[in-house]
Amino acid sequence: LCNLFTLPFMDQAPLYNKISPNSPMDLTNTTVLADVRTVLPAYLCPSSADPNPAQNADNKVNGVAIGLSNYLGFNGNGDYRCNSSKPNGMFYMNSQTRIRDITDGLSNTFAFTERTTVNDAAGTNHIGSIWAGVTPCASTPNNFENIRYGLVQARVGWSMINGTGYQFGPSSLHEGGVHVLMADGAVRFASENMDASNNPSTISSATSTYFRLAVINDGQVIGEW
């Protein structure tokens, strides 16, 4: 929901006031549907060729296309399911991360990244985001995919940067990598060749530069990248 809560700071207070962050959205209501289909350029990468509102089935909510966002927060280096223990990244459902919690240092921690929804050459979907909210966990219990919409599915260990697997990780149409927003506000370019591991046996530990940057408090040393 971070994209939604940011609206008042983007001169979009009237739109924010039309959408309650604490209530389900009635997408059968034509007025509500028109609001959540609003295209917000600030939430789109300039290089994006994504159809907007979303046309990819994986980016729709209950089959309904609504406005896209290319930007998602990092939830850490592990799997995130609705009933999982607290993730170790900055953003996750009901997160309340404060600056003091990021003990690895703001310049050493991923906050946000980008993701395209355009299929790659292999035909796999890049699962993108919507800005208006999230789908409820109750719709598919214990399934972390339920929070991919507009929240935190920049999940380390899934397809890596610009990978060719099913796209839950960072992706873009930029040559060679993606842009990332660090916790200190700096924007950097993360190469698709960054030191990373896609080994399921190491998914819960910070075993590479990529993993360590996604975690806010593991105490691991991070070199140049």
For the regions a language model picked out, list residue spans one by one:
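Surface-exposed loop/linker segments characteristic of extracytoplasmic
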Residues: 1-225
